[in-house]
Amino acid sequence: IIYMKISSKEDIINHFINGNKSDLYIGVENEKFIFDTKTQKRSTYIQISNILKFLQSNFGWEKVIEGNNLIGLKLNGKQVTLEPGNQIELAGAKLKNIHEVCAESFEFQDQLIKACNEFNLELLSIGYDPYTNLKDVPSNPKKRYEVMTKEMPKLGRLSLEMMYQTSGTQINLDYSDEKNFSSKFKLISYLVPISIALFANSSIKEKKFCNYL
């Protein structure tokens, strides 16, 4: 991590100016829940490991190992990673337009569905897990999540729910100058509340109605 010392307004402005790019790309990260079709419970680390091994064997992904544990995959600028509650995330490659992003997403989803079918698992593309109690979400051996699980509650009472009970989407956009940045930032500011209402809102929490639409 590179920390930037901020001592003036100009330091902040220069940080964004230094981010100007001539070649503009878009990258999308999205997470998905995996459930066991027999037990209707969230997938365990062992089950997710089987998925990763299947993807590696059948679609050319390379393993990412931490200690003795398989924690992800990589291929052509893309990465598959494990989130704290064994959500699977695709961190996409840098691409030129949303059509390429869409194709990348559907290709990985097709691979993931094939892997899930092999192990009696099911993919669920929603923003919040409405069924599983926080204490019942299976964990995995990634070291950073062990630290985060201890430290995050100090920063917010819903931090563990965010880690273990949500699946998010993150969009990374390059910008060419201040005007280009402003137009993209403005548009995203309009779209995010709508997308949250549509895709990340849940009327059910841990199998009970929670008075949200």
Residue ranges and their predicted role:
Residues 3-157, 165:
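Terminal catalytic/cofactor-binding subdomain
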Residues 117, 128-213:
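Loop-rich catalytic cores of soluble enzymes, especially ATP-dependent carboxylate-amine ligases
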